[in-house]
Regions:
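Active-site phosphate-binding/coordination module
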Residues: 2-60
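Gly/Ser/Thr-rich active-site cleft segment
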Residues: 11, 47-150
């Protein structure tokens, strides 16, 4: 398949998964999907508000409390589709709805919920590019478009 003919692509996908990466953007474990029940109600209590345990934030708290050696190696966390965007564009970005669905974005002022980041230990400075669902969020680099697949 000749990728040079590709003009655009769209990402839509499964939300509430936790794709955890190290500082070299290598996956540290298989993605924890939305239907995984590893996180229980206890992490939600730490937030000070009701948070559905299957969202991404509580999953990170589960890793922090039950797998501390793994948690210490996490540099950043993406939703599965945002991980694909990172691989396609080499740019970290997320739709506001996706980040809000992680329980990390307050959609009113479009700001991170610092209390939640304090609990999970995550630093969202790498994820300052939030876009609307219909906005362009990046460009596929020429090096990717020049690849031949198949």
């Amino acid at each position: 398949m000749d990728l040079s003919a590709v003009k655009s692509t769209g990402l839509s996908g499964q939300m509430h998964g936790a794709t955890v990466l190290d500082s070299a953007d290598q996956g540290l474990r298989p993605c924890i999907l939305w239907n995984d029940t590893c996180a229980n109600a206890k992490p939600a209590q730490l937030y000070g508000s009701i948070v559905f345990p299957r969202l991404t934030g509580p999953k990170l708290l589960w890793i922090k409390h039950d797998k501390p050696n793994l948690f210490d190696r996490i540099f950043r966390t993406f939703l599965p589709k945002d991980y694909l965007r990172l691989r396609l564009t080499e740019e970290p970005a997320s739709e506001m709805s996706g980040t809000a669905g992680m329980s990390w974005l307050d959609t009113g002022p479009k700001d991170c919920r610092n209390k939640i980041f304090a609990v999970t230990g995550q630093d969202m400075s790498y994820m300052l590019h939030w876009v609307g669902g219909c906005e362009q969020s990046g460009a596929v680099p020429a090096s990717f478009r020049e690849q031949k697949i198949g």
